[in-house]
Amino acid sequence: MITAQPSPRIGFAFVRKAGPLAKLRDVAPTRRVMLVAILVSMVVFLDGTVVNLALPATERDLGGGMCSQQWVVDGYLLAVAATVLPGGAISDLFGRIPVMRFGLVAFGAGSVLAAIAGTPAMLIAGRLVQGLGGAFLVPGSLALINSAFGRAGRPAAIGSWTAWTGTAFAVGPLLGGLTVDFLSWRWIYVLSAIPMIIGFALTFWLCPTPGPSERPRVDVAGAALSSVGLAATVYALIESGRHGWDDSLITGALVVGVAALLAFVAWERRASHPMVPLGLFTIRNFTGANVVSAFVYGGITMGSLAIALYLQEVAGYSATAAGLITLPSPIMSLLFARGVGGMAARIGPRIFLMTGPALAGIGLLLIRPTPHGFHVVTDVLPGRILLAIGMVLAITPLTAVNLASVRSAHSGIAAAIQNATGRTSALIAVACVGLIAAGTVTDATFTRLLQVSAALFFIGAVIGGLAIRNPAVPAEPVPDKVAAPVP
């Protein structure tokens, strides 16, 4: 029998019936939502970091230097950041599950293109297609969870989602290192395509979600302005390391990018159907959560990339050894993210959004080269553990407070805005790595990168304390089920 509001744990209660299809029918609907949402999101988060430790091997095989390494990461992030906001309206227009299927197909196709790449340009193109698909998956999965669970069960559900996706995000460098050392960097992309096939099949396990009361419209002008603004700005930041700021193409790209972003804000203020409803930013907790997200994701992206490059290119560690040092993050996330979500729901998210980023920043400052030699166990591991603790304290409450600050009907766009904020921040952070490191990772530039990353975390902690309020939690009825029994 299907229960009305089961626990969001990822587990299945089977009634004893003959045959696997009968067992599938008895899986609780909300657990089906959790399974699909977590599977598709895990791969997106995993692919966001799995390439970090493969960058040196990719550069040795295809060439291109640090600029190409930055583009391999930023090509993916750029596509996500540019597409995720119009993706919310597109999902409402065509249905969340059909659009999720499109995202799965696009992500899989991009993975195949990247796997067979023979040039840096082809690899970057594959990453762009991956990002296009990924933009429809993470916000859609959070919107499904938000619709499937009532207010009482939602924090634990988001905690479970965060535990698994956070683990995927954190374990990505380790899997990337193992794949590079024992297979090839190309297998990173081959293995990314397989879960997309499984996820595509599982979406037929769910029934279509209720559509909006009004037919949504896609903000084409807003999407174009934001895409041009982000692409031109990131191009200028990355390519300035190769051509210099006195190059007319670089300065022109920066001017075009900034102008397009300013025009985007002006357009959204007067558009009848804006891609970003600016009225949401009058909600204190929504604005605070997104600003904190920007600094936290910028800090973790820059710090993680700096550590991955330094350990291999300067300290001389293998990709696997460099990946092993990331283990504290997935362990902490898997063990404690769900519990942190429940605790934040009881005592409020504010203390977590102050403490978490602060601890993460301190952890990064503990990682530094020493004049008497460098060893990952003594010089990296303590800081990585503290960084992992800080991230697990911050991420679940950050996601929960963003969704809790808006009505359920706006959960899709709220999730999309937060995802776009985090991706855009990560995009800019990666683009700035070359500027801060002056094109080369050394002891001095590595320390400088970690200091900048820590500063981003500290700013996020201050904003979390000043901008976030612990909300009163009113009772909310259990929503309608999203999933339907398998026919």
Explain the meaning of each model-derived region.
Residues 2-205, 340, 347, 353, ...:
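Transmembrane-helix bundle of Major Facilitator Superfamily
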Residues 31-53, 66, 72, 163-164, ...:
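12-transmembrane solute porter fold
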Residues 82, 136, 228-231, 302, ...:
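Residue-level signal for the membrane-embedded core of alpha-helical transmembrane segments
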Residues 120, 184, 211-216, 240-246, ...:
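Membrane-interface helix caps and helix-loop-helix hairpins in membrane proteins
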Residues 201-222, 243, 266-275, 465-476:
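Helix-loop junctions on the cytosolic side of multi-pass membrane transporters
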Residues 211-212, 227-250, 265-266:
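Phenylalanine-glycine-rich, low-complexity intrinsically disordered regions
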Residues 475-485:
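Short, highly charged, low-complexity non-transmembrane loops/tails of multi-pass membrane proteins
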